[in-house]
């Protein structure tokens, strides 16, 4: 649906306004800007917070329930979260590997092909997502992909700094956030 609400409404209030999560299930993840922003987990552990937020909030707060976050562009900027376009809510039974692959394939087909970083990069991301979903990657290969200096981060950085348009900067986000925030879900797809 389409909802127009005041700045500052919480994520929980918006989801309730939209009818809640299907079947009364609990929230697993949310994409605040559609696939462009990637997947934000329902519970955001302190280690995943931007440093500026870690300094602002008391040390005894170990995690934040994303449902309690106020939806205001300035707050989202502080949290390094995107806000805009469509918001997608994923219930506990959602397969985020499947969802990430669908997003990666979407970006691959949406690339106009004019710039090489986006054309090649979005294709490579979709290939990696396909290998993950088909169970062709080992645990060690998946761990390498998830590192801050791994090939996904390097590819994302190259795409962001050399792509002609914004598509190249956001195309890696579904896979990057999947690997960062949902390692247990990714491991279920690992080849023994």
Where are the language model's segments positioned?
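Redox cofactor-anchoring modules in respiratory/redox and cofactor-processing assemblies
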Residues: 1-192
């Amino acid at each position: 649906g389409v909802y127009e609400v005041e700045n500052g409404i919480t994520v929980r209030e918006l989801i309730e306004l939209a009818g809640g999560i299907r079947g009364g299930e609990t929230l697993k993840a949310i994409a605040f800007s559609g696939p462009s922003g990637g997947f934000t987990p329902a519970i955001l552990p302190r280690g995943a917070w931007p440093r500026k937020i870690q300094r602002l909030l008391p040390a005894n707060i170990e995690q934040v329930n994303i449902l309690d976050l106020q939806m205001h562009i300035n707050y989202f900027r502080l949290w390094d979260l995107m806000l805009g376009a469509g918001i997608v809510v994923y219930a506990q039974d959602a397969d985020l590997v499947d969802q990430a692959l669908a997003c990666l394939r979407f970006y691959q087909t949406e690339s106009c092909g004019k710039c090489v970083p986006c054309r090649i990069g979005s294709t490579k991301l979709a290939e990696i997502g396909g290998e993950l979903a088909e169970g062709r990657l080992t645990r060690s290969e998946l761990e390498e992909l998830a590192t801050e200096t791994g090939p996904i981060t390097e590819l994302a950085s190259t795409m962001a700094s050399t792509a002609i348009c914004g598509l190249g900067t956001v195309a890696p986000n579904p896979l990057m956030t999947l690997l960062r925030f949902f390692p247990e879900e990714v491991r279920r797809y690992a080849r023994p």
